[in-house]
Each structure stands twice: as structure tokens, then as C-alpha cells.
Amino acid sequence: MITKRAVFIFSLWTGILFLGACQPDLYPGRNATRQTAELPVRKADLKYAKGFSITYYKTFKQVNVYNYEGKRIDTAQYLLIRRGGLIPDGFPNAQVIETPVRSIIGMSSMHVALIDFAEADGILTGLGNLKYASSVKVRKYIREGKIKEVGQETNLNNEMVLMMHPDVLMAVGNVSAKVNRFKLLTDAGIPVIQNSEYLESTPLGRAEWVKLMAALVDREELVDKKFDAIVLEYNKLVQLAKKAVVKPSVITTMPVKGTWYVPEGNSYLSHFLQDAGGSIKWADTKGIGTLPLSFELVSPEALKADFWLNIGYVNSKAEMTGRDSRFADFRPFKNGNVYNYNKKINDVGANDYWESGAVNPQIVLSDLIKILHPELLPQHQLVYYKQLK
């Protein structure tokens, strides 16, 4: 017997196949007279982010998202046109997005932060996992049923996304011309932006991705003003931290199954700690990620370190020694200098450090300076970090 669900799915996939056959009709204005090529007017002033660019033309915006390894063949291109506007010639491989975006599905808490920063939280209609969100407004929309859970990227509910048909889906990942995980969606006229902000090596570089969201929702002036204020405050704090006479040594994270992942010299965390006036071992390495090292290699540094930060999913020193009793021998453990970034975890387990903290690096930096050099910021109260007891 043919069920109603089977009929629905058959109809849905038939529609998708039909749309795929009529690909030129999917994008707004595609059948209208195409606009002749224009000369660029200006480029967005991106001082810190390396993973994308925005070029402004008279009637549209061109966004490029780059492969972090620098392979230009992997560049993803998007045309942001005014709703109902004509599509310019000369961009055969570009995905087209109508602006201002009125509906978006985000796949990570960072995407919630970008939307919130642009003060456009009402456009969020879907999340990969509803537990990701810390924003008070977004949690309210979730309770009201205005934001749907669409599944993780590895198990994305394509049927639901197709039915919702957002103006854009923001995914997580490095751009690659060889892999198109979202072909079904793009063939159905749903643009997918690969957001790789997590690959930026500096706190301000990661935060500057707010300008991509600004371009999508036509709020560049607002976002630029807010971001400029963050840059000013962040750089003031860096100069303040330079006044410290001593740079305390810092170890981070905990070993996982015998491997201790420590930040490389050009990584996001390494820049944060050095900007806060701390010193870390392996700061002279060139990578932007982590070094997988053995417990035996890291433990001599941990035995003599001044501070231990960014422990992971633990809330107390007892939890730490419950995982490995040897932690009790480390100097920062003995001296009470163990701090974790889990002060702002809500009732569903979302950690706001990864959300609002990502677009407010000046506050994270204030926390780190307060921990490492409390005399420099005597009035500051920790926002994202807490001392583990």
C-alpha cells in the first residue's frame, strides 16, 4: 500500500528533478534581460579576515569565499543582488542571493552570533542543532517554534530544508571545488555559503566575518561601526597587556586518549594568549591549528606552568583528577590557577564563549588579561571564564 508519506516524498523528488531540469529559472531575474557587466566601485575594508572578500558594484555585491590553503580554483563566488534585480553577466559559476536576506538556516553557534551582531535575529529560521544557541532572543524564537532543527551537516534533513526554502543556508567547512555536499540544495535554488571563519588565525580575523553577514542583510554601516569599536578596544587592551613586566607561562586543554593537543604558534588561541601577555610553549611553530603531542612531552611544561586554561568540558578540579590523577602534580593545579571558558553555559548546554565570545574578542581578551595580570584590570569581572575549584 502506498502511504501518504511515500506519495509526498515522490512528489518532492519529482519537483526537485523538474527544477533541476529548469535550472535557469531558479534564480531571480535569470530569465529577464541580463544586466551588462559593471566596473567595481570599491572593496570592503577587511583588515584581519583572510577567508573572504566583498566587492561592491553599483547594483550588486560580489562575495568570494576562499580555500584556506590558497587554492583559487576552490574559490566559491556569490552575487548579492537587490530583490527582484537583474543578474549581471560575467559570473557563470556564481550562486545568486537576493538581499536583504529574509530567511537563513545556520549550522553553528557562530552563525547565530553573526546574525545577532547584525541585529537581524528575526531572519533565522533553522539551526543544525537547537541546543547550539545561547542568544536570549533566539532561544525565545525556538520556544515559540519559529526556528526548526534541520540536523547536522553529516545528517542534514534535506526534505525539511527544501520545504523551508531559505534565502540562504550557511554551512561550516573549507571551500573545495572537488566536493559539493550541498548539490541537491543548490540545484533546487537554495544558495549555500561555506563559512570557514574557524580557520582564521587571529581573534579579530574570526570576528570580522560579521561583515559577510552585514552584506547579506544590507547592514554594513551598522556592523562596520560596531566592529570598529571592537578593534579599537581590543588594540587598547593589547597595549595594556604589554605593560606587564612578567609574562606568565600557560598550558591549555587536556590530553585526549593519550594525545595532548596544544595550540600552534599562529593559531587563534595562541594569538589570544600572547595578546593577553602570556607565554606558551611551541609559540614558534607556524601552524594555525594544534600540535598532537604525547602526555610525556607536555607534562614537564605543565609541572612548572603558571596557569592552566581552556580545559574543556569539566567544571571542577575533582573532575580533572577523576580523569587523570597526575594532574594534581601540576603547578597551576596546586596553586589554584586553573580557569575554564564555561562560565556562560545555559540550561540546554550551549556555551556562549563559542557564540557571542567569537564576535566579542575584546571581552575574551579582557578576561584573559584579568586572569594573567589582574593588577592591569582591577575592575573587570570575568564574563566567559571561571576559576575551577
Regions found by a protein language model. Give the residues of each.
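Bacterial Sec-dependent N-terminal signal peptides
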Residues: 1-29, 368
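Bacterial Sec-exported substrate-binding components of ABC uptake systems
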Residues: 22-112, 222-251, 371, 375-389
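Structured C-terminal subdomain patch of bacterial secreted/periplasmic proteins
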Residues: 27, 108, 200-228, 310-389
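A short, structured surface patch at a secondary-structure boundary
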Residues: 64, 69-162, 168-174
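Second-shell loop/turn segments in exported
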Residues: 94, 99-103, 113-114, 146-152, ...
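Extracytoplasmic ligand-binding site segments that recognize negatively charged/polar headgroups
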Residues: 111-112, 127-137, 177-180, 196-211, ...
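Soluble non-cytosolic domains of exported or imported proteins
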Residues: 151-156, 172-179, 200-207, 221-228, ...
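Flexible, glycine-rich surface segments
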Residues: 236-324
